Amino acid sequence: MNEEILQMMNIYNTFNFDWMGDEIKTPSDLTRHHIKKKQHDGENNINNYALLTTNSHHLIHYLEVNYNKEYNLINKLLLELNESKKEPTEEYFLEMKKILKIVKKDIKNKKRKRK
């Protein structure tokens, strides 16, 4: 396992759910998401990473392209969590869930309309 991921798992007590609330089935499923993009001078270290499962990582990049407002709200939450150096709180996950619920509902409706 990547040393930075392991270090972050311990700092943020991230063993059951990633930072977007997705269940961690195996630690090897965790990835490092750059909160501030490298091409926008984002650091390549734990001060700029969010711990996301592969599924969440794909989702956040989908949101970046298709739901920019929600992507920015989520990235703001990720940054605040990163800077706190503490484990995600219940309030944090509730806020994340609220944003994701809106997006997932819209995605589901769009899929229905295509059928």
Language-model segments: residues:
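Short amphipathic alpha-helical segments that mediate assembly, nucleic-acid/protein binding
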Residues: 1-5, 70-74, 90-96
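Residues that flank catalytic or metal-binding motifs in active/ligand-binding sites
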Residues: 14, 31, 47-49, 77-79
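Short cysteine/histidine-rich metal-coordination sites, predominantly Zn2+-binding motifs
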Residues: 34-41, 67-75
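Short beta-strand-alpha-helix junction that forms the catalytic/metal-binding core
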Residues: 40-59
